[in-house]
């Protein structure tokens, strides 16, 4: 009982930003999707059956226009080619589930003298979907593919979960000898590098991780009791550096554009009353020098801060009614500019686009704001509820996009995903998609050609510019393939969801609670 209470305290102490950026709001009305089926969701019997709904003509309306999302229609490619009906690719059979439980019987300890992480190889025997110690399965909080190497995936969470796997595309299609597998879903044990040193207790929570832009190193933030630390590891699992943090938890990690500095946001309780404010620290990875900026009297619990680098020395800081530009000198972090905010602003996320020099902020009131270099602000009422996801469309470095177009996607509690042209924010969205429940994450492929949207139990993938019908669909359902088993006391509601593409845009990682799926996608 004490162990379980400790785990609950770990989760309850996490900052509430997770509820905004990746939350799964409870008791939302389940609304129809533009991708319809004649089978009701409640009647699903196949383990990976689509979370479809009946043909009820209740597609969720556009937040701006009040129109129904179009149902799938025939697509005409030309008068001589005739009419073709697009087929949605079902990804259930292209799924691998990674085990998150520690394999104590086969793991090898780290060597503290050479700083190398432990390499753990799971047993080759059949895996039980519900082992005796399943109730202690870690809760997944973060997952992220290496931005340059499509075979490397990292994950972090409670119970000292911090590891990286090397997973080739072909290996994800090799099923484990699970007697309960139906042949459609592959549960696998994969060797991994643990990113925890011997000094970190097994009860630690790793709440943040971030690959650098070059994919050569990964930073993680671990907390245990009243202590916290940031570790930097090379992608081969060797330890590079460590920074102690005065007060846990670290709620954000952001690498600078050249990977020379790492920004971290954490509370500051040095005044002893528990509400001192927020501390922004920049660690220089090459020199181990640190710079700090204190934001007094900021309620970090209710209004978590987010940050985005705009150059190698400048970054934006936002959260609640705060919108600041800060600048790093050789000796300090100094205010660069304070943007004009309103009393009712409730900023939750910030994302900067170096191509257009525009910064985008989202709010829990559904407002998307676009800020130019001069601090001019243009606001869009994007959603009827909180914006839960925000991402600029990535483009290949050598591409030449149209001068009059720069796309950004938002997802919201209102079950809608919209793609906007930031160059013309007064216009209607370029595309909008709807799903059956609140959006918990959106993710563009690295080349910007496709976008995935996720709810708590369903993923749809669209080709950007084609919003009539999704290209692919994946649904989550109870199945032995979730090798990290559901704990008896694990809550049905989930605060954390991970969704990200590999560097090639051919595999999605999707995580929730104690489960992590790798989903193959064929373009």
Predicted regions and their residues:
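Blade-level signature of beta-propeller repeat domains, shared across WD40, Kelch, NHL, RCC1
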Residues: 495-523
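Canonical WD40 repeat/beta-propeller blade segments in eukaryotic WD-repeat proteins
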Residues: 138-144, 202-210, 248-255, 300-308, ...
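Conserved strand-to-loop turn within each blade of WD40 beta-propeller repeats
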Residues: 156-159, 221-226, 266-269, 275-276, ...
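Per-blade loop-tip surfaces of WD-repeat and WD-like beta-propellers in eukaryotic adaptors/scaffolds
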Residues: 90-93, 125-126, 164-196, 224-242, ...
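Intrinsically disordered, low-complexity acidic/Ser/Thr/Pro-rich linker and tail segments
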Residues: 1-144, 151, 163, 168-196, ...
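Helix-rich alpha-solenoid scaffolding regions
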Residues: 187-191, 197-214
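Loop/turn-rich, solvent-exposed surfaces of beta-rich toroidal or solenoidal domains
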Residues: 437-465
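Structural hallmark of WD40 beta-propellers
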Residues: 150-154, 215-221, 240-241, 260-265, ...
């Amino acid at each position: 009982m004490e162990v379980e209470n400790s785990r609950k305290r770990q989760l309850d102490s996490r900052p509430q930003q997770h509820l905004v950026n990746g939350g799964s709001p409870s008791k939302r009305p389940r609304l129809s999707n533009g991708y319809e089926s004649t089978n009701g969701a409640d009647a699903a019997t196949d383990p990976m059956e689509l979370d479809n709904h009946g043909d009820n003509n209740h597609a969720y309306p556009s937040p701006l226009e009040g129109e129904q999302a179009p149902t799938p229609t025939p697509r005409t490619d030309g008068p001589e080619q005739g009419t073709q009906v697009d087929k949605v690719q079902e990804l259930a059979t292209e799924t691998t589930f990674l085990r998150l439980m520690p394999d104590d019987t086969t793991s090898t300890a780290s060597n503290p003298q050479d700083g190398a992480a432990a390499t753990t190889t799971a047993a080759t025997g059949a895996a039980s979907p519900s082992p005796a110690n399943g109730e202690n399965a870690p809760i997944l909080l973060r997952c992220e593919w290496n931005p340059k190497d499509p075979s490397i995936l990292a994950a972090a969470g409670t119970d000292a979960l911090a590891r990286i796997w090397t997973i080739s595309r072909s290996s994800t299609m090799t099923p484990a000898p699970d007697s309960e597998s139906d042949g459609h879903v592959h549960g696998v044990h994969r060797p991994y590098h643990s990113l925890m040193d011997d000094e970190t207790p097994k009860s630690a929570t790793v709440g943040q991780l971030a690959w650098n832009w070059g994919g050569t190193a990964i930073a993680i933030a671990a907390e245990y009791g009243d202590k916290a630390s940031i570790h930097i590891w090379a992608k081969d699992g060797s330890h590079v550096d460590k920074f102690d943090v005065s007060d846990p938890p670290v709620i954000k990690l952001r690498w600078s554009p050249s990977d020379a500095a790492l920004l971290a946001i954490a509370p500051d309780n040095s005044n002893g009353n528990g509400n001192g404010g927020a501390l922004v620290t920049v660690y220089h990875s090459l020199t181990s020098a640190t710079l700090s900026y204190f934001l007094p009297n900021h309620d970090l619990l209710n209004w978590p801060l987010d940050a985005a680098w705009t150059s190698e020395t400048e970054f934006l800081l936002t959260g609640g009614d705060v919108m600041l530009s800060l600048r790093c000198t050789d000796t300090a972090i100094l205010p660069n500019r304070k943007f004009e905010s309103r009393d009712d602003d409730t900023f939750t996320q910030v994302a900067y686009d170096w191509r257009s020099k525009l910064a985008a902020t989202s709010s829990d009131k559904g407002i998307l704001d676009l800020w130019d270099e001069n601090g001019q602000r243009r606001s869009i009422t994007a959603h009827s509820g909180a914006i839960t996801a925000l991402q600029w469309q990535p483009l290949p470095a050598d591409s030449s996009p149209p001068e009059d177009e720069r796309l950004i996607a938002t997802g919201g509690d209102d079950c809608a995903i919209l793609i906007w042209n930031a160059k013309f924010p007064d216009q209607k969205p370029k595309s909008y998609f709807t799903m059956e429940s609140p959006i918990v994450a959106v993710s563009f492929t690295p080349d910007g050609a496709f976008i995935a949207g996720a709810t708590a139990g369903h993923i749809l993938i669209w080709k950007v510019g084609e919003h009539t019908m999704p290209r692919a669909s994946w649904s989550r359902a109870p199945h032995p393939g979730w090798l990290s088993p559901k704990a008896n006391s694990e809550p049905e509601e989930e605060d954390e969801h991970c969704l990200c593409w590999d560097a090639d845009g051919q595999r999605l990682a999707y995580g929730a609670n104690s489960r992590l799926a790798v989903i193959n996608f064929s373009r």
